[in-house]
């Protein structure tokens, strides 16, 4: 959500810190918080003023009218405060319909004052600007401030100066206090703006001869502005409404939501409830809650929540297991119901999200069966058949009753089934995959009926008509938006519309091109892309079977200059970049329509976008939207989902019904409903779920009224805001004459005892007129076709449509089959429709899932088991979990081979390169390239040579004699410096460890016998570190129990031992590189006196 209430303590803390005014604000930071856990001694130590002043005490839990409810203790001593708190602190209280525990109180100094010194101040945000309310009589009995207070609208980007305050607001204020009040209100407004408040009320504001006192304060801030205000806000805590506890599970899901690009919401209404929901989509989640409440389940509804925006399988698993753990804590005598619902997704891979839910169901199958949970599933969208299949299968394998339905079933029908209001049908067979668009259109299961009921000639004529201006016939009491133009285009999109896409959204662009192709457009609708984080280049896409290139520009100016035909920009920028990029876009006169996909743009910034768009005559769709679609012409981004849904919902050609919705998921649901009950969609727009969408319901309804091809209009309204009343006024004034079907979702809100913020930021009623129930009633009285519930929406649409057909308003026309579009390889592979041999194979590592896996072991387990470098090397090199002593031995080998000074060839090369100014990788590589038979390769050779001698059965003396006879050196024997009298401590350490920990050391024993023979001839012919590592490694592989003899021999043959030296010595080489850089050594040139110049004599003469 966007606007969130904060506690009075938080509001005052921010006010005292950041308000800038010449008025003397008294009692700054004088407040103390008391909870059931408060240590009074510590509290008095932190706030010594509690002992010296009379006090006021009140609960700080978002309770309105505390004074009227007797919840304020006034003019008390500290003992009086304690006595007052005793029967209240931690006790249950009822406020209106809500019952909750009083557990957070605020103590402040008592301010003696008269009634004449009490004032009322309030600032709140609207679409047009911020209203400032002032009343000269504040306090408990202030009454209806909307009717009594002086009111001043401060427009977007306008400033409030003290003179305007005195002139418009302080009309009835005492003369001697006007200057102080004007300064304070001016500072308060600047503070409100700077810290992104959406609501700020002080009642009473007391002004005495000593200064200004802020007694009671209520406030909301725009939570989406956190990235702007974090430094000033700090870590704000958003308390739940009174009557609803704050649960750790809600905090856990909120934390998941904050870390994810997807949306994850959870509100617990009644943890003991019988009906639980897990719904995909902000709009759909409201519709399901409405339907449950309409069917009498309000007291049994346990939670409200939603997941959307393509969460990963792991995120969905975490969300699902949280809900399943909550619902399996307390039994219900009638068992429990879990509704896994959702509209038809636009871009979320349903199979991926359902696999996360299925994992959670498997993990909780025992408790689910114990609590007699029945699950009802309904979903549509990309790959939904696979999702429904895995959901059905888990029901069969676990024995949990799971009823699964797809798009053939009305979205909310499963609620009626779950609550026993309608029978559970035998499930119709569903397709095995989402590949209908592979088939010839005439034989496809998604092909519409052979006749339709709209005139193609009429629609086509309208598409190429010049843009018209909307008539400015708005209700008189609405605030007009300043516009430099007379109006905005009636026609936003045509078959020739060209767009620029901001953001590297290749999947969305490909979806748009496939839609263009299936609509038989002559050219792709995407002319270019803009992405500031890469240089100019071209991106490859498919146009039917052909490959085409679309330019990608770093700068928007270049894209606009090279594509003057573009008049639409689709903005996929993140919430942090969307405002700036949209503002930049509006500097180009060619752009007439902008779609802003991002969710989470602060409302104050959105209002600035709206103001500039109105001045420029630009239509904004969004923010927080999937976009819109005009069948046969153009679609924005991911709207309408994949091609199979485009075909199933007949979105490849225009129908006669236009719709406008807030929700992206519900707009796709409307596509489905309208295609099943009428001849199809003419145009559909999702204006977005924010409180201030760039364009409103009325903007689009007026366009549809003025568009000849549109015969009827469908509006899916929502709780929050008053836009739907403009439709009522439009009908009464005769501006709207076409039949309109409308339903406002969110009717359940009036049935809840405490306020619930739904999935959309704007879905919250701030007054009675903003409730869905009030709006539906007003629409019905105005003559709009309003169903009794969302369940009946399709029936009403069909009834109105059939009347239009019967009256000849819509004339039947022949269906035209769309062209066949091939499926993307990656999607076909995911659906299991195709296979091909892989170019590469790997058996050691898998990075594709939620966490990295080494040879079958998740990375979390690697750390949990403290496997260390040796354990990881065992997994990656040998695909084995080696014994602890083996892991330690490998690490010891890496330690002793890490370096052997700067004089050896590898280190020398590394140093030379480093001093030549080369980078780390180049220097390291030059050192590694010296490793071979003469340097470092002795590990492999020694292991092979000693193994062969040992396995052949010859005794050590025979082996030494044989090598001498053949004139070969024994690899691993001999050292330039070390000898039997000056032993190599590296060898000694390893030898002692191996003998102490290895179960058997036959090859090491053999090598030591060889050493006795060789050192008897020459003391430096010892078993060196290469030789010891080589023979000990063979002993480890053969005798640790993890390998067969064949596997052990194979690892020696393929050079595993050489890897030990390469890996170990790399550490040393890197050390030498860093050392040279740190010492700032210059280019090395070898001295002449260290080089023997041996030239041919006849040349030197």
UniProtKB/Swiss-Prot annotation:
Keywords: Acetylation, ATP-binding, Cytoplasm, Isopeptide bond, Lipid biosynthesis, Lipid metabolism, Magnesium, Metal-binding, Nucleotide-binding, Phosphoprotein, Transferase, Ubl conjugation. There is a cross-link at residues 540, 546, 554 (Glycyl lysine isopeptide (Lys-Gly) (interchain with G-Cter in ubiquitin)). Its EC number is 2.3.3.8. Mg(2+) binds at residues 257, 260, 262. It comes from the Eukaryota. Its cofactor is Mg(2+). Residues 478-487 have a biased composition (Polar residues). Citrate binds at residues 309, 346, 348, 364, 379. Residues 441-457 have a biased composition (Low complexity). The modification N6-acetyllysine is found at residues 540, 546, 554, 948, 968, 978, 1077. It catalyses: oxaloacetate + acetyl-CoA + ADP + phosphate = citrate + ATP + CoA. One of its GO terms (molecular function) is ATP citrate synthase activity. It is an enzyme of class 2 (transferase). Phosphorylation results in activation of its activity. Glucose 6-phosphate, fructose 6-phosphate, fructose 2,6-bisphosphate, ribulose 5-phosphate, and fructose 1,6-bisphosphate also act as activators. The modification Phosphothreonine is found at residues 447, 639. ATP binds at residues 58, 66-67, 109, 111, 118, 216. Residues 4-265 form the ATP-grasp domain. Phosphorylated by PKA and GSK3 in a sequential manner; phosphorylation results in activation of its activity. Phosphorylation on Thr-447 and Ser-451 depends on the phosphorylation state of Ser-455. Phosphorylation on Ser-455 is decreased by prior phosphorylation on the other 2 residues. Phosphorylated at Ser-455 by BCKDK and dephosphorylated by protein phosphatase PPM1K. ISGylated. Catalyzes the cleavage of citrate into oxaloacetate and acetyl-CoA, the latter serving as common substrate in multiple biochemical reactions in protein, carbohydrate and lipid metabolism. Homotetramer. In the N-terminal section; belongs to the succinate/malate CoA ligase beta subunit family. In the C-terminal section; belongs to the succinate/malate CoA ligase alpha subunit family. This is ATP-citrate synthase.
